[in-house]
Amino acid sequence: MVLLDPLADALSIIKNAEAVGKDSCTIRPASKLIGNVLKVMNDRGYIGDFEFVEDGKAGVYTVELIGRINKCGAIKPRYSVGVTEFERWEKQFLPAKNFGVLILTTPKGVISQYEARENNVGGQLLSFVY
């Protein structure tokens, strides 16, 4: 089986595990991008702790779920967003103002739209979580 978008697969695994009420889930294959997105989700309080486990291949992330995710997904295509355009994309992908988070990749790394506003930096949209 060929994975065309590992980030989208990882987010759908998390969403489906949350929907059936599981306490944890396993994401494979692991990558730096997925790890950085999980870190942002952890910092914003959507997931519990996560850890990388080496399995002799690409590795595995074990994620502790806390029941805070209603929906999450990857944004395709990866739209480029300037600092002044965040509100437009929040209206498109998030259900209400100040509810949920957009995750984007910037020259400063993978961060949320709130941190991007503080740092006055734009980037490309990766995913949304609420």
Swiss-Prot record:
Transmembrane segments: none annotated. PROSITE patterns: RIBOSOMAL_S8. The keyword rRNA-binding applies. GO terms for cellular component: ribonucleoprotein complex; ribosome. Keywords: Ribonucleoprotein, Ribosomal protein, RNA-binding, rRNA-binding. It holds the Pfam family Ribosomal_S8. SUPFAM superfamilies: Ribosomal protein S8. GO terms for biological process: translation. InterPro entries: Ribosomal_uS8, Ribosomal_uS8_CS, Ribosomal_uS8_sf. GO terms for molecular function: rRNA binding; structural constituent of ribosome. Part of the 30S ribosomal subunit. One of the primary rRNA binding proteins, it binds directly to 16S rRNA central domain where it helps coordinate assembly of the platform of the 30S subunit. PANTHER family: 40S RIBOSOMAL PROTEIN S15A. Belongs to the universal ribosomal protein uS8 family. This is Small ribosomal subunit protein uS8. It comes from Methanococcoides burtonii (strain DSM 6242 / NBRC 107633 / OCM 468 / ACE-M).
